[in-house]
Amino acid sequence: MLAPRWLTALAVAACVGIALGVGLGLARPRSAPRSDQNRELALHGQAQWAAGSRLAPAFALRGAAGGLFSLRSERRHIVLLTFLDSRCKRACPLEGRMLGDVGRDLKSSGVPVELVVVTVDPWGDTRGSIRKFMRESRWNLPWRWLGGSPGRLRPIWHAYGIGVKQVPGDIVHSVVLYVVDRGGYLRIAYLFPFVPREVALDIRHLARSY
């Protein structure tokens, strides 16, 4: 299942924008499709889907610690899904710290949330670079950093509208954060930079409505 065309186009455009030093947030649309149900929940995010309307594209990948993660089998947690480079020096560390802020906001809420990262740098990620990234981002949520061969990852990047390009000394890629509910359905997509407080608020709303 492919991402909405407008989101894919924005993600690819943002991929180019990052190479030029332009934040993805500058490419945000003035309005995005929102379901009546999500309006009632007062959710944020540039793309929103009604409950049960769009299954998140399925994938199964191994984590940095070696265990296999299947998105389709994950029903215990609301999943925050994003795509990062552990050696990135620009947008990724910023998003990492924002995700840390989301986790701290949710710490006392009791909401079952898991952070799932799919790498955009299968050529350079190491366990050491992943641990360093996680430590500097100060994550307190349960998290998984998933990888695989470029051939295995490309269909997943494509399904979620993530543009990835190798350039000398860097990986240029788009930055999108998805929320997948406990039924395995897409609910919200945020373009970078998002507001951590709004993401945490949306997750609380979804947890109460599920």
PLM region spans:
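Hydrophobic beta-strand anchors of alpha/beta hydrolase catalytic cores
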Residues: L80-L81, L115, L177
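Structural micro-motif
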Residues: P142-W143, R154, H158-Y178
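Short, small/polar residue-rich loop motifs at catalytic or cofactor-binding pockets
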Residues: R54-A56, H77-I78, V172-S174
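Short active-site neighborhood of thiol/selenol oxidoreductases, capturing the structured segment around
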Residues: L71-L99
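N-terminal targeting signals for export/organelle localization
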Residues: M1-A58, S209-Y210
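Structural microenvironment flanking redox-active thiols in thiol-disulfide oxidoreductases
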Residues: L94-I156
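Thiol-/selenol-based redox modules, centered on thioredoxin-like
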Residues: V167-Y210
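A short beta-strand-turn-helix
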Residues: F59-L80, G103-L106
